[in-house]
């Protein structure tokens, strides 16, 4: 979802739970509030009732009965992933800061470009989507997850000798990745 709406316009499209209202009140930046609301608009358009979404202690969204979920938003874009198997999604604006933190997520065995901000952001998105999907505390992105960009816009990620599919895309100055827990 390309977030072009004003916060009030997004809010008017939704009937928010008290929990959502409380969370919104605690968000300082308008871009964060708009991302939060855009995710809920996406959920509504996918017929996922907002009041049936719960959060684990580490912040992972889930439904007691229903599909697996993952959400992400960054400045002007929001994304959701819904699946019958665990999924993870991440969208990020490509920023120079990624170069400074690369050592925290680049694994020496990654088969990925790391020579540009865009390439590093693509890699970060895949690893962050994997982290959201796996949801195991203590995962070290630079040691526990490896990534192989096998083909244009898709590849395989590995965690504990299990392989998972991922898909990624980039546009203007954004990157997005989707991971799916399907053993190959």
Predicted regions and their residues:
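Core catalytic alpha/beta fold that binds nucleotide/phospho-ligands
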Residues: 1-184
């Amino acid at each position: 979802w390309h977030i072009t709406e004003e916060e009030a316009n997004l809010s008017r499209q939704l009937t928010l739970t008290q929990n959502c209202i409380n969370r919104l009140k605690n968000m300082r930046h308008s871009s964060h509030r708009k991302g939060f609301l855009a995710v809920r608009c996406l959920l509504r358009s996918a017929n996922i009732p907002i009041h049936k979404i719960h959060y684990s202690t580490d912040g992972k969204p889930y439904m007691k009965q229903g599909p697996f979920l993952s959400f992400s938003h960054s400045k002007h874009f929001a994304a959701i992933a819904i699946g019958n198997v665990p999924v993870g999604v991440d969208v990020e604006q490509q920023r120079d800061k990624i170069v400074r933190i690369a050592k925290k997520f680049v694994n020496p065995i990654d088969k990925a470009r790391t020579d540009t901000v865009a390439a590093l952001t693509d890699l970060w998105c895949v690893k962050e989507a994997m982290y959201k999907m796996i949801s195991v505390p203590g995962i070290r992105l630079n040691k526990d997850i490896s990534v192989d960009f096998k083909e244009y816009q898709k590849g395989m990620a590995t965690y504990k000798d299990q392989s998972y599919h991922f898909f990624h895309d980039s546009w203007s100055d954004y990157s997005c990745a989707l991971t799916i827990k399907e053993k190959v």
